[in-house]
């Protein structure tokens, strides 16, 4: 979002950090499409959504499967488990969750690629909890279509994001009280923050 990033935290460092603090890692990978918001800072290409060419999706999906094998594979029996062991971590990380997509527009381009990735993961690693996305907001077309896709595929969990005003949070403390807890798809709140016009932080946003 326009600020400096060292790019010094890779999967290995992230997984080790989670291990050190006793947290479950949740790496999030692109669903075969780029974030439509990533080019909005002075770049006129922002707001569009392309997709990895279908001819390259097989290789991209294999990269995702390789990451799971790298995290969980046996150090002696698997290619990527051996790579992990040679890097200094012979014990598997026991990865349980993997996110596919983040605040994406739920278009035909997205749905086709997400479905391919989801099915490939479930086929090879049926125990893996795939966390999907239902768009950038908690309402609107992408939210509705994202939930439709999650219900259709039986996605175990979706990541909902909330960037709202202090008043919204105060008036929606019971937001999930009526959530159908018998649904197969559960909700993970991966991002939330209170914003006022201009997105400046103050005591009001801190307290809500």
Predicted regions and their residues:
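N-terminal catalytic cores of secreted or lumenal carbohydrate-active enzymes
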Residues: 1-146, 152, 170
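Catalytic-core region of carbohydrate-active enzymes that cleave or remodel glycosidic bonds
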Residues: 119-122, 126-129, 147-152, 156-208
């Amino acid at each position: 979002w326009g600020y400096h990033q060292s790019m010094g935290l890779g999967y290995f460092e992230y997984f080790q950090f989670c291990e050190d603090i006793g947290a479950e890692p949740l790496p999030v990978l692109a669903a075969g499409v780029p974030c439509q918001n990533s080019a909005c800072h002075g770049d006129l290409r922002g707001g569009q959504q392309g997709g990895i060419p279908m001819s390259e999706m097989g290789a991209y999906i294999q990269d995702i499967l390789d990451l799971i094998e790298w995290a969980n594979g046996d150090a002696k029996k698997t290619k990527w488990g051996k790579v992990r062991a040679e890097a200094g971590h012979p014990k598997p990380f026991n990865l349980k969750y993997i996110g596919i997509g983040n605040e994406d527009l739920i278009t035909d381009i997205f749905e086709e690629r997400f479905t391919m990735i989801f099915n490939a993961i479930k086929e090879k690693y049926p125990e893996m909890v795939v966390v999907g996305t239902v768009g950038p907001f908690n309402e609107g077309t992408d939210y509705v279509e994202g939930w439709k896709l999650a219900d259709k595929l039986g996605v175990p969990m979706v990541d909902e994001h909330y960037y709202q005003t202090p008043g919204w949070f105060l008036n929606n403390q019971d937001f999930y009280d009526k959530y159908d807890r018998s649904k197969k798809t559960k909700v993970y709140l991966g991002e939330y923050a209170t914003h006022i016009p201009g997105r400046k932080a103050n005591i009001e946003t801190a307290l809500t």
